[in-house]
Structures are given as C-alpha cells and as structure tokens.
C-alpha cells in the first residue's frame, strides 16, 4: 500500500538513488499504484539530469495471485532499465529519466496519473504521448526521450504547503477564498 507516501519518503528515496547513481546502470522502483504517479513526478523534479533510468512499476494484483500483472511489469521494467542506446556514441542507457512502466506502456513520470482502480491499464498519460509501448517487442519513441542537459543534481527542498484547487463553473469567490486560506499554505495550483 502506497497511501502512506510522504514528502519525507520522497526525499529518502531521492537521496538513496542519487548517492548510488554511479554504482548502477539503472534503477527499478517497485511501488504501490495509488501514489506511484505522485512519486514519479516528485523524483523527476528532485533528480534533474539524472542521466540514468529510474523506472517505477507495480501491479494491480498482488504478485502471488495467479493472474497478477506484477511479474510482467517487473520483468519489462528491468528490461527497460537495462536497454542501452546503440545509436549513442557514449553507449549510455536509452532511457535517462524518471518513467513509469505499467500496462504495456512507458510513460514520462511527471506526465502520468492513476485513472482506474480496477483495470490493468490503471496509470495513464493523457496529455503526453507514450514514450514506448510493449507487445512482443519494446518499441521506444526515441524522439520523445529526454536527454540530460547538465550535471545530475539532487534537489531536496520540497514544500508540503501546496494544494490543488479545482475551479468549477459557478464557484463563488468565497468558496475559492476558503480553499486558499489554509494555515501554512504557500502555493496553489488552480485547475
């Protein structure tokens, strides 16, 4: 269950990945589906220019269940993390960013969200194309994959004083004001 994920845990995970960056070619993070997209997004901003794959994956059904999606998701995530770029003169990893692999689709970590609690395509990226699709072969969209534009960094200054306000037709100024008058609130994303 990933419902207890927090800003502090994202910091722990980001530090762990950053300090082991030079020891491994890529990383696979097994994660619960409820907060996987939030974690992927946080890691993508905490670890800019990481330069190596960080692939988050998980399953809708527990690994011990006969019809689990977890085995295929894990094996494919490992394959994605271990795929080298044959066209790169430095022969580095093909994927060099935080991604989610789930339900036969490779998604940018900060462009995804969970939309379905029951289906095997539970995580989606509706506003950005898939970075890759998986069938018999893994087909990457090389033109969409990010490349580092500088040194890898660890940015730990996350602020939990942020909220999202969903604007709806007919919302009164008082209702909006009430949502923005939270003690300790430092920023709001208006949708």
Predicted regions and their residues:
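Short, charged beta->alpha transition segments
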Residues: 16-17, 39-45, 174-179
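Short Gly/Thr/Asp-enriched flexible loops that form oxyanion-binding sites at enzyme active sites
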Residues: 29-52
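ATP/NTP phosphate-donor binding region
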Residues: 1-19
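Short beta-strand segments
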Residues: 29-31, 55-58, 99-103, 166, ...
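Internal gly/pro-rich beta-alpha loop/helix module
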Residues: 56-137
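Short coil/turn connectors at secondary-structure junctions
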Residues: 22-26, 49-53, 93-97, 102-103, ...
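Accessory alpha-helical/coil subdomains and C-terminal extensions
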Residues: 108-189
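Short acidic, glycine-rich surface-loop motifs adjacent to enzyme active sites
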Residues: 24-36, 183-191
């Amino acid at each position: 269950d990933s419902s207890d994920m927090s800003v502090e845990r994202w910091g722990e995970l980001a530090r762990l990945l950053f300090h082991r960056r030079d020891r491994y070619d890529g990383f696979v993070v097994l994660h619960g589906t409820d907060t996987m997209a939030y974690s992927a997004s946080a890691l993508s901003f905490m670890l800019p220019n990481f330069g190596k794959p960080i692939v988050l994956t998980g399953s809708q059904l527990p690994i011990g269940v006969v019809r689990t999606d977890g085995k295929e998701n894990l094996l494919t995530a490992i394959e994605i993390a271990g795929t080298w770029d044959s066209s790169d003169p430095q022969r580095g990893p093909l994927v060099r960013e935080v991604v989610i692999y789930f339900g036969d689709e490779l998604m940018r970590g900060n462009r995804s969200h969970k939309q379905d609690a029951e289906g095997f395509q539970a995580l989606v990226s509706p506003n950005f194309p898939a970075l890759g699709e998986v069938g018999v072969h893994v087909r990457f969209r090389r033109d969409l994959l990010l490349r580092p534009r500088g040194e890898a960094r660890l940015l730990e200054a996350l602020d939990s004083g942020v909220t999202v306000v969903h604007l709806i037709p007919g919302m009164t100024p008082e209702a909006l004001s009430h949502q923005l008058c939270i003690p300790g609130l430092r920023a709001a994303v208006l949708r």
